[in-house]
């Protein structure tokens, strides 16, 4: 990935087997791709989906494949537009989120590539955790920094999906809706203990080998990637009280989330800097709060690409104008200069 290029990054479309979202992200995506991407004259073009592109989580392999086919059938225009992009040389990148973690299963990723780029699978890449463009950007969904969604052994999903992994605490709560409150609480407690055990396992040799292989694939310093894997460690003693406070505030119609970059963004950017792997931009999704911000004690700028679904939680233009769809642009000049930022696309061109 070198030379002049333009990167478009967007997230949290939540395309599923139905199409009942009032913002119609599945219908808006092809319009965006044709008006912004396919009309661009940039010599290299990349579109990055920063997680939760699809509703594809908690499924075994066969069900994951079947769901992907159903999503394809429901959102044909979106998939055809993506196929057109790939056919015209646009590189498509899919970073997995907590809602589409099964996308990285080898068979599912291969099927996605076959659907979007029948003539050349190299045009479609799927990432279990993050995408790294040296000196330019790092993009990840962001759920690894949210304790109740965090999956410490995330890289194992690229081998067998979530088959061998315990559910994160919040997923454990949601997986047992028919149980009593006490039964669901017990499931969460067990998931917390499992997360604590998983945090210890990622510090052992077996997981180090997965990290080393991923660092080579990402062209990212191995020690840097190891340290990133250990950021935002799950700790029950801090996760549950914070969650309880958020639940109480949410019930009262309030939120503790502000409009500034999360502390984890600064920690990640400074970790990269410390290893000589600093980047100009750090991009996430997950929170459904679109924003751009400077980071403390670091030259890296942070962008959250918000959501294209109706569940907008930020205070940006998309809160009052549901026809404003957030995305990030990162331009790399022929001289290596990097620029960009958060943008809003409107179907009417406004």
Task: Give the residues covered by each predicted segment.
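Extended recognition/assembly regions associated with phosphoester-bond processing machinery
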Residues: 1-350
